[in-house]
């Protein structure tokens, strides 16, 4: 069978880096295949699809050796949707894609509405793109991609910024499209559940950008589990097992593991009551631009707690963080930090007390090298250079960035950029550390190391406030969970109580950690058996 996409002995090196990011890669993909590319952070996954899509070297400079066979009409959905938008409004952005297909203007409005409905982008077509949440931007990017009707669709973590329910909806949509149109699709993904089940092949890269496995999902998962764990690659929680089998068989190894995890969470279940309040909101209105999201928000955050803020895309989670750090102006209501009104803190003192890690790491980079980016804050505070050097080198080592110390932050992979953004904040000993999607784009090993570092910082008394879509992370780390849903603050309490509250979980469309789902469905099985 003739190849639809292929490369032979492909080696790619970016000019500012001494070593290739991809090394002697050879593969062949047939028309209609669904292929998942896996590998640790920085292994060249995004580079590989950029070469196959024709972005490298046509639009991005790099030294490319080997042979590549591409299709003429390709579409790519990137990790960061902002990087591919060129218009101001939602309908204009989709229309731009349709214009590239020479669609008559009089047909566009109906097609735009159809595409928005297909990706569940439920906003006014005239909405300014910059006012959309990260997840809504991902949906818009997908609509633009589908408008092009390309021969091959490339997806670089297409649901990374979506809430769990939205993530499953998009993957179900893509699975439906692939079945209806025999569409060739190439994916790069960190979180495998919901996508690996319908892939034809899995290609596994190592840290050096070499292919170490290429086969069916089941074969690769079973044969290379040790290599994947060592490389820090997330594994699916259920696949290749069947969920129905796990629930029905209480002696199944996964059943035993889920029961033990549930009991451990139950024992850990407690609320902190004796700590002082470090952040308090009073009649606060969450608003972004002219849009009001939540009115009259009252909540307390206690010193030393790990607080998780969850909810659907557009519910105000990131906006709340920006209000707390004064990046978004407060139009109504009040925020108090350590009993003092937020308006009364000077910028310098506020940022010495609270650090903020953006959802998009590039927004906080201001230096030309990774080393200088981490060192910048200490130098601004006139630390002795010996102290700056010592602390910076320590953080480079702990976050696996030593070999990138002299490169520009913008040339890092998304996972490496995220590690750098957190490392710059951990240079200091702030009272409050605020993180927007801290594990976004991380492989399992680096995510675990990051969480270990944050837990250590919490043990030293730092208050951690994070926005996340990772419910396992919430369950493992959070002392307090805040749920924002459809313009309301609907929950304030422990993870255990939240995930055990079936009615609330259902109404908020939360996808709970598997051990809670297992216990709920196991009760149903036992009830039917009786």
Describe every region a protein language model picked out.
Residues 107-124, 386-404:
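Conserved ABC ATPase "signature" region
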């Amino acid at each position: 069978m003739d190849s639809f996409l292929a490369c032979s002995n492909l080696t790619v090196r970016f000019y500012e880096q001494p070593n290739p990011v991809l090394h002697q890669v050879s593969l062949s993909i047939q028309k209609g295949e669904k292929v998942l590319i896996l590998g640790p952070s920085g292994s060249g996954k995004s580079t590989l699809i950029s070469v196959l899509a024709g972005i490298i070297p046509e639009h991005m400079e790099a030294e490319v050796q080997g042979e590549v066979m591409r299709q003429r009409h390709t579409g790519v959905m990137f990790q960061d949707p902002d990087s591919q938008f060129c218009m101001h409004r939602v309908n204009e952005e989709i229309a731009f894609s349709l214009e590239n297909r020479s669609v008559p203007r009089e047909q566009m409005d109906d097609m735009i509405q159809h595409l928005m409905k297909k990706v569940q982008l439920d906003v006014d077509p005239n909405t300014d793109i910059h006012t959309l949440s990260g997840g809504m931007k991902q949906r818009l990017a997908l609509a633009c991609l589908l408008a092009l009707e390309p021969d091959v669709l490339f997806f670089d973590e297409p649901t990374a910024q979506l809430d769990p329910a939205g993530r499953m909806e998009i993957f179900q949509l893509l699975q439906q499209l692939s079945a209806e149109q025999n569409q060739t699709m190439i994916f790069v993904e960190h979180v495998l559940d919901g996508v690996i089940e319908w892939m034809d092949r899995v290609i596994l890269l190592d840290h050096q950008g070499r292919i170490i496995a290429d086969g069916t999902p089941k074969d690769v998962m079973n044969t290379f589990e040790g290599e994947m764990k060592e490389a820090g690659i997330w594994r699916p929680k259920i696949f290749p097992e069947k969920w129905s089998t796990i629930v029905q068989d209480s002696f199944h190894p996964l059943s035993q593991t889920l029961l033990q995890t549930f009991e451990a969470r139950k024992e850990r279940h407690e609320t902190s009551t004796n700590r002082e309040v470090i952040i308090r909101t009073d009649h606060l209105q969450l608003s972004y631009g002219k849009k009001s999201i939540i009115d009259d928000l009252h909540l307390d955050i206690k010193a030393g707690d790990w607080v998780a803020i969850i909810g659907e895309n557009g519910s105000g989670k990131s906006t709340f963080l920006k209000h707390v750090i004064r990046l978004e102006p407060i139009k109504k209501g009040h925020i108090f930090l350590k009993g003092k009104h937020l308006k009364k803190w000077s910028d310098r003192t506020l940022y010495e007390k609270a650090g903020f890690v953006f959802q998009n790491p590039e927004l906080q980079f201001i230096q030309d090298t990774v080393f200088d980016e981490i060192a910048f804050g200490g130098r601004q505070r006139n630390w002795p250079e010996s102290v700056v050097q010592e602390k910076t080198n320590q953080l480079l080592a702990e976050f696996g960035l030593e070999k990138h110390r002299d490169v520009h932050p913008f040339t890092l992979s998304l996972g490496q950029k995220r590690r750098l953004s957190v490392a710059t904040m951990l240079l200091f000993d702030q009272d409050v550390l605020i993180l927007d999607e801290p594990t976004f784009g991380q492989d399992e090993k680096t995510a675990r190391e990051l969480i270990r570092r944050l837990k250590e910082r919490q043990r030293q008394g730092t208050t951690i406030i994070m926005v996340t879509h990772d419910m396992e992370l919430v369950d493992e780390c959070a002392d307090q969970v805040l749920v924002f849903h459809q313009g309301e603050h609907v929950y304030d309490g422990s993870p255990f109580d939240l995930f055990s509250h079936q009615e609330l979980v259902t109404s908020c469309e939360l996808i709970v950690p598997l051990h809670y789902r297992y216990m709920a469905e196991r009760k149903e099985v036992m009830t039917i058996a009786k």
